[in-house]
C-alpha cells in the first residue's frame, strides 16, 4: 500500500513497506536500503492501512481501514511487533492519511463522517476532533502547514477545503466561493510540497494556501522525495523491489527483498477461452489464470486499477474492465508475455475508460451484433450510473447511456435473443460519498434497435438491487435477496417467484449448456430447472462465497478470500 523512510532503531535508516492482505491481517516489512535484507512484522488486527508515517518519537504508525485503528511499531523494540494503540473515533472505519503537527501530535483524516482525529505520542492520548464537514463522508487528505494549522481536503459530493487550528480547536471552510464546485462528484486534494507550503488540487486547478488565504497558481514545487539521511532518494518501489538514486554519483541501484503473504482477496472470476478461469485480486490488482485441463494456476501480471470488476471471453481473447474509471483492456492468451500498456505491442492493451458515468463496471455481457454492453456504478459523489455499448471491432465505445435508471447504478445485464432486448437490474445507490435518493431499485429492458429503454418496473417493491440477471429459453431471470424471479419478455410480466438457498451473489447467474440455470448465493451453489420451475439442486459451500462467477461444462468457480473454489456440477438434464 505504501513505502516510507524511517529510523531503523540503530541510528540509521530503513525502508518500511506496508502490505494489505485478505488471508490474514496486514504486515509491515522493514528493509535495509543497502542490502535488501528484510524483516517482516505481522499486525494483530486490520486487513490493510492507507495511512503510514514515521512519528516524532521515531516509531512507525499505520492507520487501518475496516476499523479505523492506530497501529504502532517501535524499531528499537522489534520484539514487541506491531501494537494496537486504539481507535480514536468509534464512528470511523478508515484512517486515510497522517501528518505530524507542530505540537508533536499525529493527525489523521477519516471516513465515513469526514472527521479529524489526533494522537499524542508523548502522552498516549487519542482525540476525536469532530466532523470537518456537516454532510460529507470523506476527509480524504490532509497536511500540516508551516503555521501549525491542519488543512483537510473534503469530498465527494461537495468538495471543500477546511482548516483546523490546534491552538483554538476550531475549524472552518476556507475555500473561496469562486473556486467552489457545486456540481456533484469532486474531491479536494491537499499536499505539502518541497517548499513547505500547502497546495490544493481541485476542479478549479492548482491553488496555494497561505495561512487562510487561497490563490490560484500555475504550478507548484514537486512533492518531497522519499530521502535517506545521506541524500539518496527512493525513486520507485513495488511489491518486493525498490530503486535508490544517489544524486552525488548519479547512479540508480535496483534492489529486491522477500516477504511472505497469506494471499490477496479475489474480487472477481470469469470464464476465458478454452474453459480457462480468469480472476482478479483487489488492492493490488493482479490477474491470474487457472487451467482446469492441467490443474495449473498462474499469476499473469498486474494493472494500475484497484480491481477488475468484470471479465468477458470474446473471440479467444479476454476483456478485463477495471475500477477506477471503468478502463477497458484486452488480453490475448496466445501471446506469451504480459505487458500492460496502450501501445500496439502491449498485452493486455488498454483502451481507457468506457465513458461518462462509469466508475465500477459491474456488468459486462455479449449483446446483439457482436457488441458488448457494460453497466456501471457512477463516479464518487455522483448519482446515476451508465450503460455503454462497446464495439470490439473498433475497440471503442460507440454508444453510452447515462442515468438509464435515474439516479441509480447498473449492476446486472442479460441479452435475451428472442426479443432482442437487453435486460438489466439497478442498484438504488450512487457513487462513493452519496446517499440514495431513490427508494427502490428497478428492473428494466433496453431496445438496441430503438436505442432507448422500453420497460422499467420495481418487481420487488423496496428492493435495493437486482444483483444478477440471466436469459434462457425465451425467459429472463433476475434476483432480489433470496428470491429468483422469472420474467416473460413477450408480455412484460413477472410469471414466477422461487426461493433460493440464501441471498444471491452479484453477477453469479447463468445458463449451463444443458439448459439449466446455475447460480451462487453467499453460502451455496444452486441449479434451477426452468421447465420444472424449481430449484432442483443446491449444495452448501464449505466457505463463504464472496465473488463469482465462472461457469464451465463441468463446474462452477467462485472466490472466497484469497482462495479459488470449484464445485463439480451434478449430472442433471434440462432443456438443451
Model-predicted segments: where are they?
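Residue-level signature of beta-propeller blades and closely related beta-rich strand-turn architectures
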Residues: 21, 66, 112, 156, ...
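Beta-strand-rich domains and repeat architectures in extracellular enzymes and scaffolds
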Residues: 1-26, 264-266
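Short, conserved, GDST-rich strand-edge loop motifs in beta-rich repeat architectures
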Residues: 374-384, 424-440
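Conserved beta-propeller blade signature
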Residues: 14-18, 59-62, 105-108, 150-153, ...
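Blade-level signature of beta-propeller repeat domains, shared across WD40, Kelch, NHL, RCC1
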Residues: 541-576
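Repeated scaffold domains used in trafficking and secretory/extracellular systems
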Residues: 1-7, 47-53, 92-98, 136-143, ...
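A short loop-to-beta-strand structural motif that recurs across blades of beta-propeller domains
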Residues: 27-29, 69-71, 115-117, 160-162, ...
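Surface loop/turn motifs at the tips and blade-to-blade linkers of beta-strand repeat domains
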Residues: 41-45, 85-91, 130-135, 175-182, ...
Amino acid at each position: 500500500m505504501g513505502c516510507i523512510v524511517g529510523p531503523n532503531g540503530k541510528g540509521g535508516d530503513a525502508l518500511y513497506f506496508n502490505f494489505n492482505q485478505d488471508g490474514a491481517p496486514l504486515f509491515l516489512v522493514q528493509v535495509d536500503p543497502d542490502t535488501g535484507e528484510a524483516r517482516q512484522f505481522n499486525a494483530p488486527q486490520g486487513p490493510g492501512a492507507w495511512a503510514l508515517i514515521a512519528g516524532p518519537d521515531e516509531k512507525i504508525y499505520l492507520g487501518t481501514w475496516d476499523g479505523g485503528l492506530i497501529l504502532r511499531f517501535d524499531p528499537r523494540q522489534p520484539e514487541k511487533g506491531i501494537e494496537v494503540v486504539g481507535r480514536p473515533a468509534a464512528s470511523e472505519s478508515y484512517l486515510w492519511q497522517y501528518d505530524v503537527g507542530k505540537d508533536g501530535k499525529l493527525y489523521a483524516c477519516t471516513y465515513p463522517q469526514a472527521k479529524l482525529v489526533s494522537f499524542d505520542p508523548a502522552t498516549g492520548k487519542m482525540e476525536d476532533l469532530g466532523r470537518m464537514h456537516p454532510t460529507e463522508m470523506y476527509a480524504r487528505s490532509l497536511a500540516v502547514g508551516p503555521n501549525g494549522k491542519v488543512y483537510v481536503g473534503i469530498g465527494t459530493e461537495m468538495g471543500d477545503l477546511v482548516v483546523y487550528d490546534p491552538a483554538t480547536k476550531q475549524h472552518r471552510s476556507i475555500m473561496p466561493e469562486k473556486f467552489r464546485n457545486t456540481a456533484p462528484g469532486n474531491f479536494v486534494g491537499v499536499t505539502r510540497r518541497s517548499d513547505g507550503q500547502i497546495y490544493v488540487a481541485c476542479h478549479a486547478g492548482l491553488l496555494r494556501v497561505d495561512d487562510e488565504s487561497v490563490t490560484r497558481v500555475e504550478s507548484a514545487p514537486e512533492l518531497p522525495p522519499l530521502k535517506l539521511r545521506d541524500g539518496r532518494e527512493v525513486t520507485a518501489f513495488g511489491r518486493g523491489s525498490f530503486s535508490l538514486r544517489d544524486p552525488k554519483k548519479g547512479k540508480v541501484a535496483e534492489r529486491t527483498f522477500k516477504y511472505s503473504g497469506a494471499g490477496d482477496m479475489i474480487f472477481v472470476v470469469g470464464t476465458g477461452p478454452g474453459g480457462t478461469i480468469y480472476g482478479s485480486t483487489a488492492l493490488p490488482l493482479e490477474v491470474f489464470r487457472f487451467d482446469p485441463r492441467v490443474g495449473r494456476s498462474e499469476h499473469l501480471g498486474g494493472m494500475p486499477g484497484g480491481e477488475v470488476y468484470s471479465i468477458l471471453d470474446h473471440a479467444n481473447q479476454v476483456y478485463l474492465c477495471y475500477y477506477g474509471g471503468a478502463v477497458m483492456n484486452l488480453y490475448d492468451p496466445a501471446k506469451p508475455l504480459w505487458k500492460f500498456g496502450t501501445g500496439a505491442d502491449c498485452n493486455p492493451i488498454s483502451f481507457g475508460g468506457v465513458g461518462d458515468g462509469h466508475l465500477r463496471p459491474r456488468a459486462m455481457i455479449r449483446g446483439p451484433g457482436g457488441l458488448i454492453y457494460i453497466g456501471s456504478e457512477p463516479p464518487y459523489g455522483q448519482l446515476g450510473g451508465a450503460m455503454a455499448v462497446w464495439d470490439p471491432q473498433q475497440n471503442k465505445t460507440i454508444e453510452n447511456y447515462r442515468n438509464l435508471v435515474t439516479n441509480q447504478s447498473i449492476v446486472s445485464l442479460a441479452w435475451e435473443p428472442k426479443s432482442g432486448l437487453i435486460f438489466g437490474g439497478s442498484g438504488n445507490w450512487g457513487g462513493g460519498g452519496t446517499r440514495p435518493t431513490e427508494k427502490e431499485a428497478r428492473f428494466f429492458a433496453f431496445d438496441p434497435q430503438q436505442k432507448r429503454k422500453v420497460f422499467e418496473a420495481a418487481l420487488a417493491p423496496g428492493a435495493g438491487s437486482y444483483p444478477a440477471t440471466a436469459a434462457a429459453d425465451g425467459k429472463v431471470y433476475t434476483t432480489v435477496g433470496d428470491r429468483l424471479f422469472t420474467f416473460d419478455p413477450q408480455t412484460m410480466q413477472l410469471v414466477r417467484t422461487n426461493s433460493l438457498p440464501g441471498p444471491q451473489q452479484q453477477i453469479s447467474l447463468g445458463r449451463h449448456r444443458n439448459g439449466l440455470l446455475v447460480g451462487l448465493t453467499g453460502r451455496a451453489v444452486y441449479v434451477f430447472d426452468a421447465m420444472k420451475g424449481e430449484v432442483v439442486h443446491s449444495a452448501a459451500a464449505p466457505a463463504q462465497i464472496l465473488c463469482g462467477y465462472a461457469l464451465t461444462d463441468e463446474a462452477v468457480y467462485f472466490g472466497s478470500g484469497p482462495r479459488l473454489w470449484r464445485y463439480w456440477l451434478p449430472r442433471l438434464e434440462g432443456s438443451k
